[in-house]
């Protein structure tokens, strides 16, 4: 069924499944396994690589100028989207929802948000005081008013 959709290879699949012997033993069974999606390879890995393999070609086909995504400040999805866009030569705008009250500078400048910036994504922070859906709508309206992502 997936064959009818255009797809680009962004990850290393299938990812391994590993038996967690110690946890299985500790629990006295049943056998516990883990799917190692950290091994997908795209921007330190993650399960969102699979959907991006379909979404990015669709964006290219539709001549999308800027891929826009929304997530929390340390969003894995946002990081992987930024990486996929960079690989495919697309601009990426990430709207990050500030969920913490008075987060430390390290939180706002390290981890995934640091990687988002490294991948060249434009970052907009939705303040805690604003509704993220309304904030996103305003950003999208602004893009459209500039003739972007019609």
Enumerate the predicted regions with their spans:
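PLP-dependent amino-acid enzyme catalytic core
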Residues: 1-150
């Amino acid at each position: 069924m997936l064959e009818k959709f255009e797809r680009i290879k962004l990850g290393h699949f299938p990812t391994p499944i590993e038996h967690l012997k110690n946890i299985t033993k500790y629990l006295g069974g049943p056998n516990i396994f883990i799917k190692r999606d950290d091994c997908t390879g795209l921007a330190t890995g993650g399960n969102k690589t699979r959907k991006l393999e379909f979404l990015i070609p669709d964006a290219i086909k539709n001549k999308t100028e800027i891929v826009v995504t929304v997530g929390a400040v340390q969003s894995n999805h946002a990081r992987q989207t930024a990486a996929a866009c960079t690989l495919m030569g697309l601009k990426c705008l990430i709207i990050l929802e500030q969920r913490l009250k008075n987060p430390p500078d390290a939180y706002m400048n390290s981890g995934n948000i640091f990687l988002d910036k490294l991948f060249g994504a434009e970052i907009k922070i939705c303040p805690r005081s604003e509704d993220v859906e309304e904030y996103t709508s305003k950003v999208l309206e602004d893009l459209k008013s500039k003739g972007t992502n019609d």
